[in-house]
Amino acid sequence: MKFIIKLFPEITIKSQSVRLRFIKILTTNIRNVLKHLEDDTLAIVRHWDHIELRTKDGNLGPEICDALTRIPGIHHILEVEDRSYSDMHNIFEQTLEAYRETLVGKTFCVRVKRRGKHEFSSGDVERYVGGGLNQHIESAKVNLTRPQVTVNLEVDQDKLILVKARHEGLGGFPIGTQEDVLSLISGGFDSGVSSYMLMRRGCRVHYCFFNLGGSAHEIGVKQVAHYLWNRFGSSHRVRFIAIDFEPVVGEILEKVEDGQMGVVLKRMMVRAASQVAERYGVQALVTGEALGQVSSQTLTNLRLIDNASDTLILRPLISHDKEHIINLARQIGTEDFAKTMPEYCGVISKSPTVKAVKAKIEEEESHFDFSILDRVVSEAKNVDIREIAQQSREQVVEVETVAELADTDVLLDIRAPDEQEEKPLKLDQVEVRSLPFYKLSSQFADLDQSKTYLLYCDRGVMSRLQALYLREQGYTNVKVYRP
């Protein structure tokens, strides 16, 4: 079985030295991706305008073809069969044998590519073979503009190459031809698509996740990152860095004015990610921000977010609308992950600014204890992406959700103080206590552990994440309250 791998057109217009480097990297990437097949008969040979792949194990054909369609740098893949030929009539006879059943009742055209010196041209072969097929298959008709079947042939010196199938590739540049980037991934639609777009452009994409509460969300995001890597970037080893950002969020909620919280949080994330990028020699950050999508993504606010660090920030989705982003997520397979990913509800301003003022932002940040940011970055967890598959299979501790309260239960309102003031929680015959989520990890141990505590927040997301975290710490007296 033989495959001819055609290069992405942008590769073919590079200078000779760059083109050779790109082809060499693409060949190495293909070998790395197919290494798990353990096929001793697999042979990959690079040429000036294509890469040739052969295997004697025909059963591996579908798996090889599927893998090739997901490797950046490949324009299309031709599944071919090599034959020898004697003359133009012999080419027609072999084509008729191969395509007779396929062309019954169909419109068709013949397309020929030729390399070498011959007594005939490509057009001569197209006319001769096409006319012969039209005469010998009565129900078939020639259609040169919109054929149902295109008969693709290649004549290479003394070989006839019958193209049995054509499969579209991913396009783009081979991973490793551009420098590394660090994607700020949240598991939603935007960050997954932006990560994919940079992989397709030839970057090795590492992942940085800011954990805003509990392991359930982290495991979900790890699964998204592993899926993207396994599907499009498994030719290279990458890092997954998880940063516990809950202490930073708590400091923002206590020290920063409501309207400035969103921009300040993004600036803190950029600062933290920049430190991580510098640590690992990564050249740029990648975010899924789109212009005007939310309040922090206006031009004014994006400029202020950029000013928090000297590191280059790439935003491949900046001009894309949400519908287009969701369609892209559907195409690459991350839509289902994104739809079920919990959205963090801890830092939601009642009146977020859409045109932040630099002096005001800097004044608010002057109240922030930056030693907290330095600490969470220094404690960041660095995981090899290949280890995530095993970690993701581990059971997540289940937390019971209740809709009714017992007299002995204590309800913990874990919302931020301003949310509690705006929508006070009043329940008869049940003790209600206020303990913002960002204080749970440090103050829950001080509570009476003989009682059962029900955690409450508006959406039920933060309460579940915090309950999971407490269960992992060994506390069994926690549940989630969802009326």
Curated annotation (Swiss-Prot):
Pathway per the UniProt entry:
Cofactor biosynthesis; thiamine diphosphate biosynthesis
Which InterPro entries does UniProt cross-reference here?
Rhodanese-like_dom, Rhodanese-like_dom_sf, Rossmann-like_a/b/a_fold, ThiI_AANH, ThiI_fer, ThiI_N, THII_Thiazole_biosynth_dom, THUMP_dom
- Start and end residues of each THUMP domain: 62-166
Chief localization class? Answer: cytoplasm
At the top of the EC hierarchy, this enzyme's class is: transferase
Would the keyword Nucleotidyltransferase turn up in this protein's UniProt record? no
Subcellular location(s): the record lists: Cytoplasm
The Rhodanese domain extends over: 405-483
- Any GO MF annotation of the entry: tRNA binding
The family database entries (SMART domains) matched by this protein are listed as: THUMP (SM00981)
Gene Ontology biological-process entries: thiamine biosynthetic process; thiamine diphosphate biosynthetic process; thiazole biosynthetic process; tRNA 4-thiouridine biosynthesis
| Catalytic residues, chain numbering | 457 (cysteine persulfide intermediate)
Q: Which keywords appear in this protein's UniProt record, sorted alphabetically?
A: ATP-binding, Cytoplasm, Disulfide bond, Nucleotide-binding, Redox-active center, RNA-binding, Thiamine biosynthesis, Transferase, tRNA-binding
According to its record, what are the GO cellular component terms?
A: cytosol
Domain of life from the UniProt record: Bacteria
Pfam families from the entry? Rhodanese, ThiI, ThiI_fer, THUMP
The cysteines joined by S-S bonds are 345-457
Q: What is its EC number?
A: 2.8.1.4
Family, similarity comment: Belongs to the ThiI family.
NCBIfam families the record matches: ThiI_C_thiazole, tRNA uracil 4-sulfurtransferase ThiI
What does the protein in this record do? Catalyzes the ATP-dependent transfer of a sulfur to tRNA to produce 4-thiouridine in position 8 of tRNAs, which functions as a near-UV photosensor. Also catalyzes the transfer of sulfur to the sulfur carrier protein ThiS, forming ThiS-thiocarboxylate. This is a step in the synthesis of thiazole, in the thiamine biosynthesis pathway. The sulfur is donated as persulfide by IscS.
Tell me what this protein is called.
Answer: tRNA sulfurtransferase
Q: What organism is the protein native to? A: Yersinia pseudotuberculosis serotype IB (strain PB1/+)
Q: Which gene is transcribed and translated to give this protein? A: thiI
